[in-house]
Amino acid sequence: MEAVKLYEQLEKDFINPSLSDEWAVYMESVFDFISDNFKKRSMGLVCDNSQEINKVYTAVFPSNGVMRSILDKNETDIMLFVHHPSIWDIRKAPGVWQQMDTGLLKQFKERRISVYNLHVPLDNYGEYSTSVNLAKALGLEIKKPFAPYFGALCGVFGKTRFSTVQELKEKFESVVGHKTSLYQNGVDEIKDKTVAVIAGGGNSIDMLEGVAREGVSAFITGIAVQNDHSKKAHDYAKENKINILGGTHYSTEKFACMAMCQYFKKLGLSVEFIDDEPVLEDM
């Protein structure tokens, strides 16, 4: 497929003028590899290295492991689709966002491997969005979106068949494939069997206010660790008796990147999701 036609289709299907983002201000160290358009608006085509796209790989972050696994395949004229153009690692706070390795980016350019990013557009409520696909994986019946974020609505409310937070936690762990955290600030019973979901980093007062307004007592997100940055959010959750379940940034957002495989298949492209490692310290 002509690369420009693929980029145009992604633009049409996901990006609209109401959405914004700010990645470029943190990415000066890799500016030599970044497209001018991405420097201006922080979404869409990150690295313009291909005229043809024969295969797409999807991933949550462009980690060294993900980039190397693609290079090890010895393929050319392909695209890496990522939810983030940088790599999250809370263990390296305050510099939690690490940039792509320049040596690997040079090899991407030589191999004609482009990089494409949808962050806010993929967080935005829709068929392929992060929270929608996490909610689906949890077996929730999605009711409505919430949580304004850079022009998007990044969260969803859904109905669960489970009656207690403990049951929901067990389901959450089976879905993400590892232990999850629970900050139990209210009763174990899930009020009205309604759950709020924000994949990734929903542990902030702005997001929790939307949960509290609906009277919801169970909230699932990715980054839930209690630290200096999140103390006010945890205090707010305690005051409003909101139980917070955390499953890591990576594990809660991977379902959207897996769902995007179906999107690219519909365009007639060969596609593969590349799994990565969750940072358990997120919880």
Q: Where on the chain are the PLM-derived regions?
A:
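Active-site catalytic microenvironments in core metabolic enzymes, especially phosphate/sugar-handling
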Residues: 1-283
